[in-house]
Amino acid sequence: MQEKKTLYLLDAYGLIYRSYHAFARAPLINDSGANVSAVYGFFRSLHTLLCHYRPRYFVAVFDSLTPTFRHVQYPAYKAKRDKTSAELYAQIPLIEEILCALGITVLRHDGFEADDLIATLAKRVAAEHCHVVIISSDKDVLQLVCDTVQVLRLDIDHKWTCCDAAYVQQRWTVMPTQLLDLFSLMGDSSDNVPGVRGIGPKTAAHLLHCFGTLDGIYRHTYSLKEALRTKIVCGKKDAFFSRSLIELRDDVPCVFSLEDSCCIPLDVTSAARIFVREGLHALAQQYRACVQEIDTEATNDTLQMTESSVLTSGRCANECFLSQVEGRASTPEVNSVLKSELKTSAVSGAIPIENRDLRQDVMLARSAGHYRGVTDPVELKRIIDCACANGVVAFDCETDGLHPHDTRLVGFSICFQEAEAFYVPLIVPDVSLHTESTQCTCARSTNVETEKECTEQHGVSASAVQDPAYVQAVMHQLRRLWNDETLTLVMHNGKFDYHVMHRAGVFEHCACNIFDTMVAAWLLDPDRGTYGMDVLAASFFQIRTITFEEVVAKGQTFAHVPYECAVRYAAEDADITFRLYHYLKLRLETAGLLSVFETIEMPLLPILARMEEVGIFLRKDVVQQLTRSFSDLIQQYEHDIFSLAGHEFNIGSPKQLQTVLFQELHLPPGKKNTQGYSTDHSVLKKLARKHPIAEKILLFRDLSKLRSTYTESLAKLADQTGRVHTSFVQIGTATGRLSSRNPNLQNIPIKSTEGRKIRQAFQATVGHELISADYTQIELVVLAHLSQDRNLLNAFRQHIDIHALTAAYIFNVSIDDVQPAMRRIAKTINFGIVYGMSAFRLSDELKISQKEAQSFIYRYFETYPGVYAFSTQVAEQTRKTGYVTSLAGRRRYIRTIDSRNTLERARAERMALNTQIQSSAADIVKIAMIAIQRAFARRPLRAQLLLQVHDELIFEAPAAETAIVKEILFAEMEHAVELSIPLRIHVESGNSWGDFH
């Protein structure tokens, strides 16, 4: 399939203006005394574009030299802008001259702005089924964004940001097609466009969410509140007049051919002469290097490049880089090391991009890094010296496996300056033996005992250890990094690196400060869903990174990767991680989330790593016996189901189950899916009221799941010491709660007999006890604190049974007359409010009518009016800001809070309430975990935190320490944060987890 063509349209004047003012305080003056700030800045930015995005079709679009139709229509258009500097104007002809010399098409049309010409060209090429990338920081061009048109903006930190429909929705909270009407309502003070007086972006967006268009708003003015209606009605003329000014013309009568805009090959020789003439020698050198790099990479279609081609492209990149390294190195030592290193066998980080769907990859560039391997211990020491002096170092380790508990270290990479990174292998290559096939030939040690010793002492891969002294030297430098209290070590998925380094004996207690970019990205957008480095690099920097699958063949490990490929891959990881650090830290600061990150999430990371390493002891014989007893029960349920159906069938087959339930037994079918009528859990629960077979099927399914998920698999997951090591996922939920996987120990049922039996298998080792500390109704306590409802606060202060009290209120009886069934209903409602339960869900939960469920909710809010007021306040505040905030300041964006769909909006409001409560509770538990760990370290104690199951913490301690551990738990957990009412915990100790509660 032929690749779709992509036309790049540059708003030239916007970039010129930005470039000129970037040097306003220190203008660049050439030998002739002329100001060349705009020329230099413009072509530096253009160089980045050309090198990163490799455009084939490119047009630089300029504004009209004469007044435009907008000035004729509205003489005050842009009248408030400062007069453009004569020095800036003088540079525009020179910029056009150089563009033409390069072979880049330059377009302008009298009477029209560049944006109109861009809109016209975008429309024309879209009709030819081409893609368009608009390079502009003008918000007006965002109204052109669609499936085939994207906008590339240069941010204040000089990073290119891809603006697609998702970006527009996030930034302006409307669709691109609604931007014209949004801007018409808002107006634009910089262009002197009036808009509607008193209408800002939030109000304008809200109106468009409700009524769709500007015309729709004016058709429904009767439904607006009086004050808003007055503004809208009075501003009608200005609104539509503003729209006529802001709307981009797509009918500019210009002559244009896509093929005429082809800029390949660039005539750098002609352009370089002009650069030299104007005293811009560095630009001449950069453009020559850029073309050489393009020519070199064009011959290298795959990642497996020959050594000679790698070194050629590396030298080209270095020639460009070395002229500027003086001004970018953080210290003289860094400068010295980098200059000497980059003059040798540097490796270019450029990787070819396959022809893929342009809607996804049109903005993706190659990482322009300068990467090299380091195998000399003396050289490594110098680099680590510079890294430590820098204060911030990105780190990434490479291993021969993906599981942190049984993998070996192959090498590591570091970066302490953007686009420059180093890879240090533990498998030492003999570079002189590399061939054109890039197969790595390593000198292997013949001393088996030495290899075994290195593996046991350092956890490093011994498959190709050349010299134990080298390994010792590398490990010494690793210890320097991880044990430097003044150093910030930046990692992506740092818990994995922490495990590997700890197992390798690099540290006992990590002293450096950890910054995990994966956790930072999650904290900024906890609903994003995916936080892989490759995805973030593409999203934030429009860089396509080398993927693991590209360098590691199926069935092999990183230890088999050829040296040059290993350098490129590993060093790029460190480089991207370093870039992510600066980008994400700034965003954390801007969003007010840096405190949550630094005081909660990062101190928690080593605690979680330690919990995973320790694990919890499992009695294999107990779970094996449970597997047998569960199998007997499952067989009995199966027999009962067959008896009720009248014949045998495959209970696991939805199709056969549909036939039995709805055709043979004539039970009422529920919701329909693509496979017929649903037989899911909710449907079977309803059918259980009508026929016993549904209840038996539910029991059969539940027990089968417990057997396969837990009793059969747990014994296999236990290590040689009998301990099971779950993984705690720090970024697994949008509310900040921790999740558990492989195995998921948080989902073992606590109420069922079978679930309790499974927990019984988790036991303390000889001479130790398990200790459980569980927060008492923490989410209701948080709700009482946040809502300040008097009835709730008084109940907790007086230690009244909150569920009995709620039952007394909603059933209008005294608390002494509350029956167990009443309390059960009240408990469901209490927690249902916290979890955002609708009347429909409550009716299903309590097996009552929806009308009755709704009446219970009404009576609940009558009982606790403060809760109702609080829930309304949360919804309104979330509607204003777009996000909800926890007690500690954690954020979650509720993107459907302004939905025009009533059900969706109500769901979003419940989600906002639930998030604020659940996130705050999660904050409290995390703060308590950190405080407890610090208290243990101060003693010091041998007690260890093993598990976190939402509001419950499980510890293992020597029996002699049980009493003091309980004291610490009460002190730290009940005072983790100060609320209006005290936090309470329930503490138990025993031999097994199943003994508790």
From Swiss-Prot:
Enzyme nomenclature, EC number: 2.7.7.7
Record carries keyword DNA-binding: yes
Residue ranges occupied by any 5'-3' exonuclease domain in the UniProt entry: 174-261
Record keywords, A-Z: DNA damage, DNA repair, DNA replication, DNA-binding, DNA-directed DNA polymerase, Exonuclease, Hydrolase, Nuclease, Nucleotidyltransferase, Transferase
Domain 3'-5' exonuclease: start-end pairs: 428-589
Keyword Transport: no
GO function terms (MF aspect): 3'-5' exonuclease activity; 5'-3' exonuclease activity; DNA binding; DNA-directed DNA polymerase activity
GO annotation terms (biological process): DNA-templated DNA replication; double-strand break repair
Catalytic activity, reaction form: DNA(n) + a 2'-deoxyribonucleoside 5'-triphosphate = DNA(n+1) + diphosphate
Pfam families: 5_3_exonuc, 5_3_exonuc_N, DNA_pol_A, DNA_pol_A_exo1
InterPro entries the record matches: 3'-5'_exonuclease_dom (IPR002562), 5-3_exonucl_a-hlix_arch_N (IPR020046), 5-3_exonuclease (IPR002421), 5-3_exonuclease_C_sf (IPR036279), DNA-dir_DNA_pol_A_CS (IPR019760), DNA-dir_DNA_pol_A_palm_dom (IPR001098), DNA/RNA_pol_sf (IPR043502), DNA_polI_H3TH (IPR020045)
Function, in words: In addition to polymerase activity, this DNA polymerase exhibits 3'-5' and 5'-3' exonuclease activity.
Protein family (similarity comment): Belongs to the DNA polymerase type-A family.
Name of protein: DNA polymerase I
Provenance organism: Treponema pallidum (strain Nichols)
Upper classification of the organism: Bacteria, Pseudomonadati, Spirochaetota, Spirochaetia, Spirochaetales
Gene: polA
